[in-house]
Every structure is written in C-alpha cells, then in structure tokens.
Amino acid sequence: MKHPFSRFFSFGEKEQEETMEKQEKEEVRKIPVSKIVPNRFQPRTIFDEEKIEELALTIHTHGIIQPIVVRECEDGKFEIIAGERRWRAVQKLGWSEIPAIIKNLNDKETASVALIENLQREELTPIEEAMAYAKLLELHNLTQEALAQRLGKGQSTIANKLRLLKLPQEVQEALLHRTITERHARALIVLKDKEKQLKLLQEIIDKQLNVKQTEDRVLKMLEAANPKPKPKRKAFSKDMRIAVNTIRQSLTMVANSGVAVDSEEEEFEDYYQITIRIPKK
C-alpha cells in the first residue's frame, strides 16, 4: 500500500517502504492539550462554534474514535497535521490530554496533508478551497491540469475556484463568511472593475439579491459602460447632391405649371429616397 499523499510528495519506492514500516510502528500517545498548536498551513480560517460544540458533546459521549495527527516541533510543542476540530472540541471539554499519532513530516508534507485532508472533507468555503488549490500549485510547482488529475477533479473546477482569488478582498471576505454564494461571486468577476464590483456587492447584501437578479444587474452595468454606437449616416456625395437638387427643381417647375405634385423625401443609411405622387385627375 502506498502512502496516500505519495503522488504529491514524489516518494520513491524505497522511501515509501520505509514510510510504511514507520507507520506500522506508530503508536497512539496521550499528549498534553496545552502543548499542541494549530497547523500554520490550515486552509480553514473560520470554525463553526456550534459544530465544535456538537462535536464536543459527541466526544464526551463516545470518546475520541480517531486520534489526531501531529508532528513534534523544536520547542517541545506539537503542531497539528490533522484533527484541529477534535482538538478544539476537547479544549471545550477541559481535557488535559488527547490521543495522538506523531508523524515525522517536513513543512511541505505537513502543508500538503492539511490542505488535501480539508479538501476531501468538502466543508471549506469556496474562497478557502481556492486558497488551498493555490497553495498546492505553489508547493508542488504543478499546472492546474496536473493538480486536477491528482485530486480527481475537473480542471475547470480548479480554474473556476482560482478565479475567485482575483476578486477584491471585501468580496473574498463576504464569501468566507458565506454572506454571498459562489455564484454571486462569479457574476461579479465579469465586471472586472473593482469599484463596480464593490458597489454591486453592497447592493447584493442590502437588497438580498438572488443570483439571477445579480446577473441581470451585471448585464445592465456592462451595457451602461459600453453603449451601442448609433449608426453613422453616410454623407452626401457631390453627385448625389446635384441629383437631388435637380429633382427638387423639376418638381417645383411641375408644381408651377399647375399640376398638384406631392413628394416625400426620406434618408436611409445607404440611399436617399424621393417618392413622387401625381394625381391622375
């Protein structure tokens, strides 16, 4: 069995075997809660306190079913690799110790495990997910297509999430706090102009616009910024002016002879029309 993150860490076969041997010898240890620190690479920036309370109640009733995973730091502390929600829950219960497995991972491996583990749980906000993808691309120097293959996701999914990081910080914060949805945010991307994006963001919040209403507002704002130019009429050529004036003079002569001539003139983009009506009687 291969290491679950070997595709990212680029372990060789020998290294994988050594890793598996170490894992087989790993034991669950009780570690003081006070000596544990959060993962500095944790993609989740907001923890739902209500859900932490629910988890604490479950742990109080059933105990810790799955130990947290940590790595030892130089200052005698232990940094969480996986299981921060469980650690926060036992703190609420007032536990002094928590069962943990200690792993020997470097910063790159620790960051990758934390990011991938959270992505697999599918509990991140769209902006946290986008940040996780961006960090994995940076850590492993991957293309979006390669990352998508390794995570088992579509390349368009990765690309759409990463576009959210181009939005103003205020919009990203709204996504983070779930004030707006990802589809609202995608509609704002189309505007490109930061001032307009923030103006519409406030309108979405104040008027509680749904996605369809937001998309309609974006369309109107784009149309207002880029009005369709009115078609320019072609100028009269010298020959055309002579022709029109000659017809007018002829009509005047006919009218002066006592014939009731009725005429209408109409200008079009490509031609000039003169309609002449002469009664039979």
UniProtKB/Swiss-Prot annotation:
DNA-binding region positions on the chain: 145-164
Keywords from the UniProt entry: Cell cycle, Cell division, Cytoplasm, DNA-binding, Septation
Any single GO BP term: positive regulation of sporulation resulting in formation of a cellular spore
GO CC annotation: chromosome; cytoplasm; nucleoid
InterPro entries registered for this protein in UniProt: Chromosome_partition/occlusion, Cro/C1-type_HTH, HTH_ParB/Spo0J, Nucleoid_occlusion_protein, ParB/RepB/Spo0J, ParB/Sulfiredoxin_dom, ParB/Sulfiredoxin_sf
Superkingdom per UniProt: Bacteria
GO molecular-function terms, A-Z: DNA binding
Compartments, record wording: Cytoplasm, Nucleoid
Gene3D superfamilies tied to this protein: 1.10.10.2830, 3.90.1530.30
Function (record text): Effects nucleoid occlusion by binding relatively nonspecifically to DNA and preventing the assembly of the division machinery in the vicinity of the nucleoid, especially under conditions that disturb the cell cycle. It helps to coordinate cell division and chromosome segregation by preventing the formation of the Z ring through the nucleoid, which would cause chromosome breakage.
Family: Belongs to the ParB family.
HAMAP family noted in UniProt: ParB_Noc
Protein name: Nucleoid occlusion protein
Taxon lineage: Bacteria, Bacillati, Bacillota, Bacilli, Bacillales
